[in-house]
From Swiss-Prot:
One of its GO terms (cellular component) is cytosol. SUPFAM superfamilies: P-loop containing nucleoside triphosphate hydrolases. It comes from Bacillus cereus (strain G9842). This is Probable GTP-binding protein EngB. Its cofactor is Mg(2+). It comes from the Bacteria. GTP binds at residues 30-37, 57-61, 75-78, 142-145, 174-176. Coiled coil: none annotated. Signal peptide: none annotated.
Amino acid sequence: MKVTKADIVISAVKPEQYPDSDLPEIALAGRSNVGKSSFINKILNRKKLVRISSKPGKTQTLNFFLINEMMHFVDVPGYGYAKVSKSERAAWGKMIETYFTTRKQLDAAVLVVDLRHQPTSDDVMMYDFLKHYEIPTIIIATKADKIPKGKWQKHLKVVKETLAVEIGDEIVLFSSETGLGKEEAWKAIHKMTKTKNA
């Protein structure tokens, strides 16, 4: 899809701060430093729309981005960062659960995992959480450029089996460096949101 407009609308922590809009929403989740910000910047053709932090666990709000006036991307704070305090982790959990369980505009989630490594227990927990609430999920297996092409299928199998990916949920091979998987990611997003691939 050709992205002509992408703007941050609001950074929210509670429902009354969410945008008052009927547009479909896609939530983007992933472990801290997995490459989620790079994924968002790449598929939106923006270099610095989402700041890429060298400090894991930096995003502590739900960041709503308006894309082409037709949908919202919701950047969810990264999980699994050990140095976050228990109280911060509890606040994160409550904020995420509130959004995922109450937001009617939410059509699907994107879960970003690192293709090079077996998904962590936190990745499994996040996927199970999404499935518990019956949220359709697209899995983005990023950093594919760091692995020889001949080993992609082997690594994909590990991702699929570790997460126990349900039928209907797509896995997209992706690279923020080369742009691999960009079109496939958009196709999956349009399918989930029933928007047109303009």
